[in-house]
C-alpha cells in the first residue's frame, strides 16, 4: 500500500512539472515579439517579430510596425510606447517626434506622437505614399479619378491645407519643407519618345519664397541640388557608372554606391556643397547603407563596417545572421534588421 501511495505522489509531481513546462512554453509563445537581453556579446538586445514587420529609427529609438500595430523601444530594449491597430500592408514614416502610419492602397493615414493619436485623415482615393515633416505636416499622394495623381498637404491639426491634381505626370514622391511653406514633388512624365523626370517645388501659401532650404535629388545619371526657386546649385554626374544605392543625408553628407568591377561596390561620399569628401571600396557588393552625422554604416554579406566621411574604416563587425538593412543610432550603435527581427549592435 505504501508503494502505491509513493507512486501516486511521484505521478502528481511529474504532472505539476509538465503543467509548469506548458505554462512556460505558452508564456514564451505569447511574448515572442518581446526583447531578449544578450550578455557577453556585441549585441545589446534582440527583437523578434511576426511576419510583415518593418523597422525604422526615431530619436535614437527603434520603431517596429506590423499587422498588430506599432511599438517603440529604446536602444537598451525598453519599450517606450505601443500602438494597437490592425494592418494588412502597413507603411510608416517617422520625423521628429511624429509617426505617420498608413496602408498602401487604403485611404486612411494616421499621425501619432509618443503612442498617442494626433489626427486621422481620409483621402478620397487609395494612397500611394505619404511623408511627414518634423512639425507634423504631411504630404499624401493618392490616385485621383480623371487624373494621374493627387497631392494633399495636411497641416499639424489634420486639416487639408493644399490640394494639387496632376493630369500629365505620375508622382513618385512628395515632401513638405521644414518650415511648412513649400512642398517638393518628384514626378515622371512618359511620352512617345522617352520618360521625363522632374522635381517641382510648390509654394503652399502663395507668399514670396524667402527660405534657403536646399533640395537634393537623385536621378538615373546624376545627383543634383536645387534651391526653393528651382535653380540648380550643383550637380554630380555619374559618368555612366551604374548606381546601386543612395542615401541623402539631412543636414549632412550624401552617399552613393556604384557597381564595382569585381562583384563589389564603390561608395562615394559628397558633402552639402557637392564636393567629394571620400570613397570606400568594398570586398563584396554592398547590401545597404545609412548615415548619421559624421558616421556611415556599410552592410556587406557577412560584415558590417562603420566608416568616416573620408571613407576611412572605423570598425568592422562579423555578422553571424542574415541582415537585410542597417540603421545608425546615437553613439554609433547599429540596428541590424533581418527578415522579422532587429538586433542592436555596439561595435
Regions found by a protein language model. Give the residues of each.
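An edge-strand/N-cap motif at the start of beta-rich repeat modules
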Residues: 37-47, 52-63
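Repeated scaffold domains used in trafficking and secretory/extracellular systems
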Residues: 48-57, 86-97, 125-134, 168-178, ...
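N-terminal Lys/Arg-rich, disordered targeting/topogenic segments
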Residues: 1-11
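Non-cytosolic head/periplasmic domains of membrane-anchored proteins
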Residues: 92-194
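Surface-exposed loop/turn elements that mediate protein-protein interactions on large endomembrane-trafficking
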Residues: 25-46, 67-84, 106-122, 149-165, ...
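Hydrophobic beta-strand positions that form the internal "hydrophobic ladder"
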Residues: 62, 99, 137-139, 180-184, ...
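Anionic-ligand-binding alpha/beta catalytic cores of soluble enzymes and soluble regulatory domains
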Residues: 250-258, 269
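Hydrophobic membrane-insertion alpha-helices, especially the h-region
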Residues: 12-30
